[in-house]
Amino acid sequence: MNTSLINQKNQTCIDTCNECAMMCEACCTECMSNTEMAGMMGRCMMKCRDCAMMCTMTAMMMARGSEYSKQMCEMCATICDACAMECEKMGNKMEACKECAEMCKKCAQECRNMMR
């Protein structure tokens, strides 16, 4: 991507959102593949899917300089926080959830930085 059109602060947030989306998808896939835990993982998987979608949309809107980028970052931070809380509940059972929670916290903070 031509980052000359995107300042470094925006690029950092875009990269973090994209990384978080991938981490959430990986966590969701890991949860689905764990048959003995599948029944307990429903909320975690739903939060991960919502978070992945929101992170992807936020990154795309920021990349094209949307006038709604700050609002998207605010919503993204909220959803990342919710996903992190849900993943933390399962973090002692699954490493993917623990890693996802940490990435979601990082993404929420980057999105909050964009609102300043």
Label the model's feature ranges.
Residues M1-R116:
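Amphipathic alpha-helical hairpins
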